[in-house]
Amino acid sequence: MKHVLQSVLVTGIMFLYSFSFGQSQETVSPNIRIQKTAQESYVHFFVNAIGTNLYYGDANSGLADFKKPALGITIGASYQAGISRHFSVVPELYFIMKGGKLKENNPITDFESTLRMYSFELPVLARLHVGKFHFNAGPSIAYNVHGTQKIDDVTTDLSFKDVEGGYKRFEAGAQVGAGYTFMVKQKKVFLDIRYCHGLTNISNSAEMYNRSVLVSLHISKK
């Protein structure tokens, strides 16, 4: 599954780039080409809502009925670098709260539990613009700064040492999504919805991958 997703991601990015390059020039005569206007470049800072969960591998598929999303926030900055009329590159850096919850009587902890990770994440996205819509795809890396696990109202810190029961500092993932830009009272409103798929196991002793859905809303002057 991971290899399939990686192949789809790479193919998608190559398609976005090749499509945008082909659209970035316009022929007006056999020997003259005129470069079309590129997408605008800008920086914006954000505080966004995020819903996160954990995937425990195919061997623990029975946990699906016990999983609950953990709500969190992301705080950071995004830079859109306009390359052509239909294409831009978007690196971002933000602080993010990840993790997931399990209901009581689950096969792993038996009690209701919440696992939280506090991380810095750096995605680099290829963005295709089609009218007021845009589509994102790209890789991301993250560094897990701190983590906690709450079981039956008892909270403990996660260990990031290379030991049984420990967790990993670094992880890699892929992000895909889409958005829409519209005007409200002379203000430009930018809505972006994104799915974040962890590709690397964050646990030293079991299968555990981060999954999240990120909703971003940005308002700027026209």
What are these regions (language model features)?
Residues 39-43, 69-73, 116-120, 168-174, ...:
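Residues that define the transmembrane beta-barrel architecture of outer-membrane proteins
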Residues 27-34, 53, 80-85, 130-132, ...:
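Outer-membrane beta-barrel proteins
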Residues 21-79:
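Short glycine/proline- and aromatic-enriched beta-strand/turn motifs that initiate or cap beta-hairpins
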Residues 54-67, 97-118, 145-168, 203-205, ...:
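Flexible, solvent-exposed loop segments that connect beta-strands
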Residues 45-49, 73-83, 93-95, 122-130, ...:
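Residues on the lipid-exposed face of transmembrane beta-strands in outer-membrane beta-barrel proteins
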